[in-house]
């Protein structure tokens, strides 16, 4: 099981997450309490192992701005967390992830229409797109087509207490956590380590 730790804002947390076994680190460039500057993201990315994916999260941003930030920071993927459509996705020259809030089984059909490398299934959006710490009914994704499952990233309220059930139900390619590894709004290294270990153990 691949694991992405999202909403990273400092070098130490990013490096520790990688040492614990994180496969991807997420940087939020959209409005959020975890928003990061281009300069800081570039500094952190420059100190991470080459094999770790560096993913930038954007919400309804222009293709030009996304591409500029991706190029300057050294992102390997961009995550589109707003209302982006295929005509915008096609203009990107970097691998992409499209986020989709899940409210019914029909969202799986909607997901298959996106021309992206991965689909991230999340809880429905609220004030901020993602990072709300709320789960959705994983059973809605239980009967996912095999080809879609191979490119599925599961997010939305995941934590050390529910990750086993989430993985068992959805069987995604990757799991994505942010608020679930925080204490009082800040990333907690102990929780990050526990989450990564549990995710990889329960998917064996």
Swiss-Prot record:
**EC number, UniProt record:** 5.3.1.24
Q: Which UniProt keywords apply?
A: Amino-acid biosynthesis, Aromatic amino acid biosynthesis, Isomerase, Tryptophan biosynthesis
State which pathway it belongs to. Answer: Amino-acid biosynthesis; L-tryptophan biosynthesis; L-tryptophan from chorismate: step 3/5
Q: Which GO terms describe its molecular function?
A: phosphoribosylanthranilate isomerase activity
Q: What class of enzyme is it?
A: isomerase
Q: Which family does it belong to?
A: Belongs to the TrpF family.
Q: What is this protein called?
A: N-(5'-phosphoribosyl)anthranilate isomerase
Species the sequence originates in: Bacillus cereus (strain G9842)
Q: Gene for this protein?
A: trpF
């Amino acid at each position: 099981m691949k694991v992405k730790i999202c909403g990273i804002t400092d070098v130490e947390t990013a490096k520790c997450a990688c040492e614990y076994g994180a496969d991807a680190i997420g940087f939020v460039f959209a409005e959020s309490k975890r928003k990061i500057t281009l300069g800081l993201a570039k500094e952190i990315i420059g100190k991470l192992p080459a094999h770790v994916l560096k993913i930038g999260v954007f919400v309804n941003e222009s293709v030009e701005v996304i591409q500029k930030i991706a190029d300057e920071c050294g992102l390997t993927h961009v995550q589109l967390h707003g209302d982006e459509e295929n005509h915008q996705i096609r203009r990107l020259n970097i691998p992409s992830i499209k986020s989709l809030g899940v409210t019914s089984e029909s969202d799986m059909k909607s997901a298959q229409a996106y021309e992206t490398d991965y689909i991230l299934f999340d809880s429905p959006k609220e004030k901020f797109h993602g990072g709300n710490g709320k789960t959705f009914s994983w059973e809605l994704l239980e009967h996912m087509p095999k080809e879609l499952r191979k490119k599925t990233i599961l997010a939305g309220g995941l934590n050390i207490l529910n990750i086993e059930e989430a993985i068992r139900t959805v069987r995604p390619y990757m799991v994505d956590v942010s608020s679930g590894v925080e204490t009082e709004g800040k990333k907690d290294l102990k929780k990050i380590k526990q989450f990564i270990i549990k995710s990889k153990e329960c998917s064996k």
